[in-house]
């Protein structure tokens, strides 16, 4: 029997006849980072809310560490929302102490825990700084610290890197990995940053129209759409995009051609070798290529292949 920390069994959520989540069954293993991907309105947020007890399903149930979710202990789950939930008039240390008191963390455990979080998330020098004076990156790291001050077994991160600079993002990623690798926590991650999902997730669920359409490792998901590289180009006249797609689709060894956010993605075998013929088709249409790159398959390519839409659409 698989050792699941969270198991969703046939979860369905309906709103006045609209099915937001449709018969979803997912098992999240202990000690893994589990990523959720889906376009806006796909049902991923509703799914997660049901899986952590914030929303009652229309039907189905959720088992957390062998117990019905209605019977789990207070503090089993830590939530780090995308919106910053901070006390602007308190210092970092005061904020962490207050949250620890809310969870009734004993003082002999609280004090070293607060200091460790300040150290691990590079906030020690700002421990006595009022939150309103922190940078955006520091506030987001404090937001995470508040979510885990009580040592939850499960941590839910909703767009944790939103708006962060690369340095702050790297600090956050390293801490997320440490929660899994050192502390053995189960982490549920939602993100629009494809590199983040790829780098951090052990497995990823792709949700669309309230249904689970794929669940696998990032590597296996990228293998699933097959061989070939992707030529990503932007034309001087976006109105010609569909004309170029029609020109290229019959070509040999071109696997797929799609328009994504005003650009054309061409997945092909020996993509670099195909560039001269592609350029001939562009010239035939009387337009020029403003920007072009050749890359390997990404998770976003997987998503587009499976759903026919971009992640932010």
Protein language model regions, located:
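Catalytic Walker B motif of ABC-type/P-loop ATPase nucleotide-binding domains
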Residues: 155-158
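Conserved ABC transporter NBD signature motif
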Residues: 60-75
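Conserved ABC ATPase "signature" region
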Residues: 97, 101, 108-126
């Amino acid at each position: 029997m698989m050792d699941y920390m969270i198991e969703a069994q046939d979860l369905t959520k309906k709103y006045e006849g609209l099915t937001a989540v449709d018969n979803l069954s997912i098992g999240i293993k202990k000690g893994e980072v589990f990523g959720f991907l889906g376009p806006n309105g796909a049902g991923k947020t509703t799914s997660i809310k049901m899986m952590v007890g914030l929303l009652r399903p229309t039907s189905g149930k959720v088992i957390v560490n062998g117990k019905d979710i209605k019977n789990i202990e207070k503090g089993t789950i830590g939530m780090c929302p995308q919106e910053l939930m901070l006390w602007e008039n308190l210092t970092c240390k005061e904020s962490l102490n207050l949250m620890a008191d809310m969870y009734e963390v004993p003082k002999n455990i609280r004090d070293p825990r607060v200091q460790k979080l300040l150290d691990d998330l590079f906030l020690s020098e700002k421990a006595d700084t009022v939150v309103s004076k922190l940078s955006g990156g520091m506030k987001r790291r404090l937001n995470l610290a508040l979510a885990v001050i009580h040592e939850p077994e499960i941590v839910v991160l909703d767009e944790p890197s939103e708006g962060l600079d690369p340095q702050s993002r790297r600090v956050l990623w390293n801490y997320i990995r440490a929660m899994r690798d050192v502390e053995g926590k189960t982490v549920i991650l939602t993100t629009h940053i494809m590199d983040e999902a790829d780098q951090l997730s052990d497995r990823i669920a792709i949700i669309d129209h309230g249904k689970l359409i794929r669940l696998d490792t990032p590597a296996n998901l990228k293998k699933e759409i097959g061989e070939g590289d992707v030529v990503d180009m932007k034309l001087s006249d976006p109105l010609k995009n569909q004309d170029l797609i029609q020109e290229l689709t019959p070509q040999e060894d071109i696997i797929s051609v799609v328009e994504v956010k005003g650009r054309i993605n061409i997945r092909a075998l020996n993509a670099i070798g195909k560039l001269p013929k592609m350029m001939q088709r562009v010239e035939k249409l009387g337009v020029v290529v403003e920007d072009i790159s050749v890359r390997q398959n990404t998770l976003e390519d997987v998503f587009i292949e499976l759903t026919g839409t971009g992640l932010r659409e």
